Each structure stands twice: as structure tokens, then as C-alpha cells.
Amino acid sequence: MRQKNKCRRKMLNKMEVVQKRKRDFVFAFRQSVPVMLGYIFLGIAFGLLLQDAGYSFWWALLSSVVIYAGSMQFVLVTLLTGGAGLFYTAIMTLFINGRHIFYGLSFVEKFKKMGKLYPYMIFSLTDETYSVLCGTRTPEDLHEDKVFFWISFLDHCYWILGSVIGAVAGSYITFDSTGIDFSMTALFIVIVVEQWQNAKSHFPAILGAGCGIVWLLILGPDRFLLPALCSCVVVLLVTRRRYPIEAQEGR
């Protein structure tokens, strides 16, 4: 009888663990839906461009799995077709994706606590994933680390799926994809509005918009992003006592 009760408790514990993992995944999936809508369409656009440049869907699959750089992958198509060298490609990558350095700083301590998942969490931190993670408030009965991982992993899968669909479809279907890249702009607008509604202080958002506009007018659309981010960081550090930055609470 004792043995049966012990086995029953073990089975119940396993079922409870499975249910908790399921709840973590379902919650993460719901949080990632806005990114899914943007990433699949943008991934399709990237796959179409890559296929149109003469590369098979295997290139779309591998680049999305290994590189996973969003806008840089679009630039990569131009670099590949133009025969750009490795050094020039590295410089372009730094200028385009250098902003991720700033994103990682706010999550590095949290990701370190995730153990073996730490390298992947750093690798998978894109613009959109960062925005979703910042706006996610994990319920007390869920594991925040697991939720964050699933959000990052699902976003990665959406991009891979869209890229492969676009590359395969481009082999058989010809259509005008003009304007499809606006889905990413729309995605950011939705995320910003949601964060604006939930934030206690709107100073960081106003500062970001102001710095972006100023540097855009000074340097133009191709060079304004990194200076704008640097300016925001400096101002936020200087004014951190008067306008404290809301921290992401751990669970």
C-alpha cells in the first residue's frame, strides 16, 4: 500500500510539473503573438528576396537559424549579390545591429541566472523580443525564466518559418510584395503603445523620440540610430535620480 501511494504521489508530481510547463508555454505564446504576425510576414519578404537573388531555400533556412539578425539579413542579400568582402560585411553588421549592445545590458544579469540557456538568450535577443520581454509581467504561479526562454525561442521559430515559406513560395509564385516590410513598423507601434499605457513614467519614451528626431535631422536615416541610442543612455544615466528607470521585477 505504501509503495502504491508513493508511486501515485510521484505520478501526481510529474503531472503537476507537466501542467506548469504547459502554462509557461501557453502564456509565452500569447505574449509572442504580435511578433509572430510581424516576423512571419517579414521572414517571407526576406525569403522572397533571397530566392530572387538566386539562393535556394536552404540558404534562407540556415541564415535564419544561425544569423537571425532581422534587418541585417535583408542587407546581407545585397552584400552577397554585390560580392562584398568579409571586413565590409562585419562593419555593416556593427553599424546596423550595434544597438543590441544596449539591449543586452538591461538583461545580462537576468540571463546569467538562466544557466545553460544564457548563450541562447543573448543570441536570440532581437529588437522585437527585447520589447516583448520588457513588457511581460509574469504571473506569480509561472516560471519567469521559462517564459522568457519560450518567448525568445518562439520568436526565432517564427522568423525561420517565414523565411522558409518565402523562399519556397518564391520558387513557384510571382507577386508584388511592396509594403510588406511595414508590418515591422506596425508591430513596434503596437508594442510602444502598450508599454506607454503600463509605464509609470513616460520620460524615457519621450526622450527616445526626441533623440531619434534630432539625430535623424542631423545625420539622416542611415546613421542616426547609434548616436540616438548613445544620447538616450547618457541622459538616462545623468537623470536617473530624478527619473528612475523602472526595473524588470524578478519572479
Listing of model-derived features with the role each one plays in the protein:
Residues 20-22, 27-122, 136, 158, ...:
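Pore-lining transmembrane helices
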